[in-house]
Regions:
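Acidic, surface-exposed loops and disordered segments
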Residues: 1-185
Length: 185
């Protein structure tokens, strides 16, 4: 898949959980590196202020978002609590205007998908390496993806960015657009 035209799976990259999760430092290396960097401006990092100011935005400025801010948003997703610390989710970053337009249509013509940064959070129960029935693993994966998305939205707010949660979409169409068999959450 050409990354210029299609979505790019950006998390996890090069990290696969093991049966036993003994080395938490492996997961935290990316986060630690990102936290060392700083965007051109930090807006607010007081958690309660961030939570109280976060709102759904339905109109976005057509401005490029700094890569370091996107990295911090993705790193925030990685800090969300997950079942067994296995991160049962994957994130797709949709950059292409054509793919964004297709997502608008897959999301019942909600125009908010034209935001400068579009992240699609998908559940991946195969990453949850627990000896439990499949329906429980699927439940854990959707919880993991949902928490990761929520943490990402809080990080975006802390960095002075707006966001919106889009929950009404055609799963099959979104899966085809981002070229995955994983179900978006």
């Amino acid at each position: 898949m050409d990354s210029k035209d299609g979505p790019e799976k950006i998390y996890p990259s090069g990290y696969e959980p093991k049966e036993t999760n003994t080395d938490v430092n492996v997961r935290n290396q990316l986060l630690n590196e990102i936290l060392k960097s700083s965007p051109t401006e930090f807006i607010n990092t007081d958690l309660f202020t961030v939570m109280s100011k976060r709102r759904s935005t339905r109109k976005f400025a057509d401005k490029i978002v700094e890569t370091v801010k996107i990295d911090k948003i993705i790193a925030a997703a990685d800090t969300a609590p997950t079942a067994g610390n296995f991160q049962g989710f994957e994130i797709f970053y949709v950059k292409s205007p054509e793919k964004k337009q297709q997502l608008v249509e897959a999301c019942n013509n909600q125009p908010y998908v034209h935001a400068p940064v579009v992240l699609v959070f998908c559940k991946n129960p195969a990453r949850v390496k627990l000896d439990l029935p499949e329906e429980i693993l699927k439940k854990f994966a959707i919880q993991d993806a949902t928490l990761a998305a929520a943490y990402s939205q809080l990080a975006a707010q802390a960095l002075g960015l707006s966001s919106i949660w889009i929950g009404m979409f055609d799963e099959q169409k979104v899966m085809k657009i981002i070229n995955t068999d994983l179900i978006p959450s």
